[in-house]
């Protein structure tokens, strides 16, 4: 929804100019980006100064952006800010994804900024991406002057109209006095309830004119009241269903990470002994090393996780949205299961699957109250799941995640990613692009902690990895950050490696170079009789580009690995370099495919552990329960 700001006056003010000092994000106070309680007396400022002062009061640490005509006025007071670090990216898409990466690993609001017209429209994809994955991002864009809006002026684009369907909310500021209130509201909306993307569009003459500033402003959001407290009656009904279940599953989504509820999830799982499946966006919400973790469900999930959902009699869905990549053909998904669906967003409940017990509320509060109710009714220890666990353990043992070496002797991408996870370990942050490498990274790296796995789950945005990894590294400079990218994705946003080199963000890139648009090629092999139309990128046949030379040109160290014997050494070599970004060009086989797989639109009953092998529903010897 889009809202022009209201013209009523607000208290006002301006601060002293101080020289700009660039600092890593962690040197700034680690506080949520919300309005402070300390009152700032009214001052007279320009609109641009009001923007900078508001961001300072909101404890913003970093802004990712590019200056341009309509937003240039904001960059002048930014020059004097002692509190705000600005990262000059090479493309506005990089700014948006970097803001998302920052928000992913910190839980704070990520901030990006662009000028009007093409600058603003270049933010469309990252805003849609953040909104789909419930990532708190605020984008500030310049706009042509108010009198020019609607005249097709130079670099004019109706960015508030364009982004209306892909943001949680957006604003077109029409009065300078409204800037503090609007920015406070934008940060509140982005970070509360179900997090999401918010855009604030400010005309050039509003930035240029005089206005009043004071802090904190009084927010005016009468229609926005996220319900965070679950209803006790629904909690009681959920506890009753759990007590009666014999084949329950905890179906966990990214909302558990967004809601900081991973410890409570573990408490619930261990209290009840119920198996856990965690979606692509929830990797790390529950430790992979835990016996109750069956892995990731869905199109490329584990056989055990898919089996658990399909054979369950109760789905306890926490912070998840029953998206098509998990459910497969919806009318055949978990056919015998009742559903408890808890989510902060009431629009998600019942959207794709009927909920027998709907619970609207903050997922942490839901789990805490559910645990208390289960203990009250003495449910823990009384759920009979012996046969259920026997079945699931059998499936897990029979069909573990695995892969076969490449028949032509080329390097297996699965081996590369598996070794990377083993060597680097669970303390690192892993960021993936979209495609085969994304799925292998989700499958073959063990995630033990939340906010260590970043990817574009809902929108599936190629080019996400490099800028998002940059944002993560700037947010957490002490962390080892690996971008796992494909040669297709990498060529969309690799220019941000120059930003990384200049800004002191030494990320490491495992480039899974199979010479093709790998996932598209896999679908062509499986569903289009191997007609490989327009998927050969020539990065193998012509070495165009030469990724080692490209990395060096962008200020990075470039390495190459073509055989299994060198994988460990080259990873360790990259880890030893911490003063510059490092790119490892792993030349891998073109024919590797991601398995298990449920074909798009097919039932989860048709999962294949490998090509032509349907383990669950054809073989009666599996001991179905």
From Swiss-Prot:
| SUPFAM superfamilies cross-referenced by the UniProt entry | DHS-like NAD/FAD-binding domain, Thiamin diphosphate-binding fold (THDP-binding)
The text of the family note is: Belongs to the TPP enzyme family.
Residue numbers spanned by region Thiamine pyrophosphate binding: 436-516
Which E.C. number(s) belong to this protein?
A: 2.2.1.6
Pathway annotation from the record: Amino-acid biosynthesis; L-isoleucine biosynthesis; L-isoleucine from 2-oxobutanoate: step 1/4; Amino-acid biosynthesis; L-valine biosynthesis; L-valine from pyruvate: step 1/4
GO biological process terms, semicolon-separated: isoleucine biosynthetic process; L-valine biosynthetic process
Q: Name one GO molecular function term.
A: acetolactate synthase activity
Q: What class of enzyme is it?
A: transferase
Please write the reaction equations for the catalytic activity of this protein. 2 pyruvate + H(+) = (2S)-2-acetolactate + CO2
As cofactor, the record names: Mg(2+); thiamine diphosphate
Q: Which NCBIfam families match?
A: acolac_lg (TIGR00118), PRK07789.1 (NF005860)
Which ranges are annotated Polar residues under compositional bias?
14-29
Keyword annotations for this protein, in alphabetical order, are: Amino-acid biosynthesis, Branched-chain amino acid biosynthesis, FAD, Flavoprotein, Magnesium, Metal-binding, Thiamine pyrophosphate, Transferase
Q: Where does Mg(2+) bind?
A: 487, 514
The question of whether Metal-binding is a record keyword is answered with: yes
Q: What is this protein called?
A: Acetolactate synthase
- Which residues are recorded as binding thiamine diphosphate? 92
Question: Would you indicate the residue range of the signal peptide?
Answer: none
